[in-house]
């Protein structure tokens, strides 16, 4: 994140999706405010935070939408996805059901996203927990099949949290069609080795 007061290069809309209880709000709050609440309440509808970060020397403003995972809020789905440039899909490595429902979330992204080349990041959360039931290999295989970035993280210990957002934003900036409508002459340099190829976060 950046405290630079200069005008941002662009403003990006980032969604955080996944089943209820997987730690979506905890990931967002750890990234934005560097706090962790083990008793974090379930999101009602949508939570919304604005922050900024520096990418390749440019300040990028982020509008982060933390969406509710409960079925009763799904009627609001189309408005959530409209105009988003990036989506973070979270599952809980201690919950097999949250992993098995990833197909549903990927279908929802494909159905409602208005940007065909939206950048997707799969996050395996709660890797600090001892009762893990979803392996790293399973997560990587799913991410590869759906052509998404992949990282393991813990909102509690902070592991992987900063990298999740950095890698996602770098990929978006490297895809000017997603955000560069008003700046036709501006292009960042070539992707770095840590950001190219594969589905793994290189942080």
Curated annotation (Swiss-Prot):
Disruption-associated phenotype: RNAi-mediated knockdown results in disrupted clearance of intracellular pathogen N.parisii from intestinal cells.
Lipid attachment site numbers (S-geranylgeranyl cysteine): 201, 203
SMART domains: ARF, RAB, RAN, RAS, RHO
Residues engaged in binding GTP: 20, 23-26, 37-38, 43, 69, 126, 128, 155
EC numbers for this chain: 3.6.5.2
Pfam families named in the record: Ras
GO cellular component labels: endomembrane system; Golgi apparatus
Molecular function terms, GO-annotated: GTP binding; GTPase activity
Swiss-Prot/TrEMBL catalytic activity: GTP + H2O = GDP + phosphate + H(+)
Keyword 4Fe-4S: no
Summary of the function given for this chain in its UniProt record: The small GTPases Rab are key regulators of intracellular membrane trafficking, from the formation of transport vesicles to their fusion with membranes. Rabs cycle between an inactive GDP-bound form and an active GTP-bound form that is able to recruit to membranes different sets of downstream effectors directly responsible for vesicle formation, movement, tethering and fusion. Plays a role in apical endocytosis/recycling. May be implicated in transport between the plasma membrane and early endosomes. Plays a role in the shedding of pathogen spores from intestinal cells.
UniProt protein name: Ras-related protein Rab-18
